[in-house]
Amino acid sequence: MAIAKEDILAAVEGMTVLELNELVKAFEEKFGVSAAAVAVAGPAGGGAAAAAEEKTEFTVVLAEAGANKVSVIKAVRELTGLGLKEAKDLVDGAPKPIKEGVDKAAAEEAKKKLEEAGAKVEVK
């Protein structure tokens, strides 16, 4: 009669650390395997292209406030939740990051709002 997985797991669960160590050594000897972690090699060449495709966090940077600074300040306040003075200082100090570590959809939405207000925006 075959032993069920649940029976094996229950037996292992009741073992001490020393007993588990001896069990691992017995498996290594019996089956000729190693319990050492296997190092996985990274992709060779084309790594930069793969990294660019996998980018999931973006930074929205206010490059320039443009002619309609008041609208840009309002948009910055709406996006960041900053007070009037903080938003004005941020807009006056352009180029500055507005949002950092956001997903692509949020970055594009922020860019759209700021551009509609008259600002020049970059998404990095």
From Swiss-Prot:
GO biological process terms, semicolon-separated: translation
Highest taxon, organism lineage: Bacteria
InterPro entries referenced in this protein's UniProt entry, alphabetically: Ribosomal_bL12, Ribosomal_bL12_C, Ribosomal_bL12_C/ClpS-like, Ribosomal_bL12_oligo, Ribosomal_bL12_oligo_N_sf
Key words of the record: Ribonucleoprotein, Ribosomal protein
GO CC field: cytosolic large ribosomal subunit
Stretches assigned to coiled coil: none
Pfam family, one: Ribosomal_L12_N
Membrane-spanning ranges: none
Gene Ontology terms for molecular function: mRNA binding; structural constituent of ribosome
Function: Forms part of the ribosomal stalk which helps the ribosome interact with GTP-bound translation factors. Is thus essential for accurate translation.
Subunit structure: Homodimer. Part of the ribosomal stalk of the 50S ribosomal subunit. Forms a multimeric L10(L12)X complex, where L10 forms an elongated spine to which 2 to 4 L12 dimers bind in a sequential fashion. Binds GTP-bound translation factors.
HAMAP family listed in its UniProt record: Ribosomal_bL12 (MF_00368)
Family: Belongs to the bacterial ribosomal protein bL12 family.
Protein name per UniProt: Large ribosomal subunit protein bL12
Organism: Burkholderia cenocepacia (strain ATCC BAA-245 / DSM 16553 / LMG 16656 / NCTC 13227 / J2315 / CF5610)
Taxonomy of the source species: Bacteria, Pseudomonadati, Pseudomonadota, Betaproteobacteria, Burkholderiales
Gene: rplL
